[in-house]
Amino acid sequence: MASGCKIGPSILNSDLANLGAECLRMLDSGADYLHLDVMDGHFVPNITFGHPVVESLRKQLGQDPFFDMHMMVSRPEQWVKPMAVAGANQYTFHLEATENPGALIKDIRENGMKVGLAIKPGTTVEYLAPWANQIDMALVMTVEPGFGGQKFMEDMMPKVHWLRTQFPTLDIEVDGGVGPDTVQKCAEAGANMIVSGSAIMRSDDPRAVINLLRNVCSEAAQKRSLDR
């Protein structure tokens, strides 16, 4: 079985001048993990932060929070060890960014991290299939990666459904434009890891939003198990 429904706030939409406090606010509001977007200005047209920030967050937040690193970088091989040393728990790289996913998966595992594999909206989901049994999580982007606050792409849901059908025990994450108005579609398609940025970060009651997202996801998962 997949690991259950989990909600990971994307800190891309947080007050970056108070990043540690923002992460604590999310964890105190019931977040299951933190989704950390690393962008290099090459793979995507934006720059965020790198492993020194991750190391600082780990020192401030302690060992318990799970850091899911979304590596939107053109050379994901370069940052495996630095991210592992900094305290990352999962290294999610883009299939489009490497010519040798197998070697990269092996390197990530040897550095003690879980493996996530992401695909952009324009990438055919079947290209991910050869690696599905070697990874811990598949990430289906529901916006073009690079910036927060974009409109959710509902036409990505068949990819999620295909992955859930073909690989029923795989963790499947969705990222981009996901919030209370769109999570139902994601959950019904089969996603069990929900990344949400603006909807949580900009809410007056982030705990309520996180609980709503988790409840919708859990109910859909329960219905799928009953329908089998």
From Swiss-Prot:
It is an enzyme of class 5 (isomerase). Homodimer. Belongs to the ribulose-phosphate 3-epimerase family. This is Ribulose-phosphate 3-epimerase. The keyword Cytoplasm does not apply. The gene is Rpe. InterPro entries: Aldolase_TIM, Ribul_P_3_epim, Ribul_P_3_epim-like, RibuloseP-bd_barrel. Pathway: Carbohydrate degradation. It comes from Mus musculus. Its cofactor is Fe(2+); Mn(2+); Zn(2+); Co(2+).
